[in-house]
Amino acid sequence: MAKLEQVGSAVPLVRAGGISKHFGEGDTRVDALENVSIEVFPGQVVALLGPSGSGKSTLLNVIGCILDPSEGKLELDGDLVYDNRWLRSDLRRLRLDKIGFIFQFHNLLPFLDAKDNVALVLQLAGADSRSARVRAVELLDYLEVGNRKDSLPSKLSGGEAQRVAIARALANKPRIILADEPTAALDSVRAGIVMDLLRKLAAEQDAAVIAVTHDDKIFDRFDHMYHLRDGRLDGNGGA
């Protein structure tokens, strides 16, 4: 297993061991991932790199409990996922409680303002509307877009919308943040700001951030980079 340097007594928030993912059967089978193993510790910001079709997004979706692995083991914050104890409802609860997702395109609901886009995640997890909105405004203030809390997504700049999307991802205080091309739609200045925010969040919340990216503008923001090619870790697994 390719391991990152362990600091103190920290244990991995994400431990993927021998993960394989296959689609289809027989002549139509596609091997999207083959025996991929990674570890990510609290406070670390890690990149998944590789050409299109290398398996980066598939691995992210397995870690995010969106896709089931065909083989291998996955531990998230100490929980062994996909063993016989886990029902689909358990996986949904795990995603709500422990995982935050950030995507290339923010996918904010166009008919809700910024604060209600964030508050909706909390309400789905069981919070009442008032406390959800209070938490949403706190997050927007923290990400320096509190002055846009009443704005619809169509009125936000690309950078502002992505910060709202980050606030939404952080609503339930996840320990694991998964980002799929989070800066691809941003210029170099805004991309740097978003990555600096993710680094700050990882440090302050003792969270793990895993990002799929092709964006060489932000490579210097990562603690470690895993390179994938044809569904396998390239070389020694990372740098």
Give short role names for the model-derived ranges:
Residues 1-22, 235-239:
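ABC-family P-loop ATPase nucleotide-binding domain
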Residues 13-229:
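ABC family nucleotide-binding domain
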Residues 80, 230-239:
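Conserved switch/coupling elements of ABC/ABC-like ATPase nucleotide-binding domains
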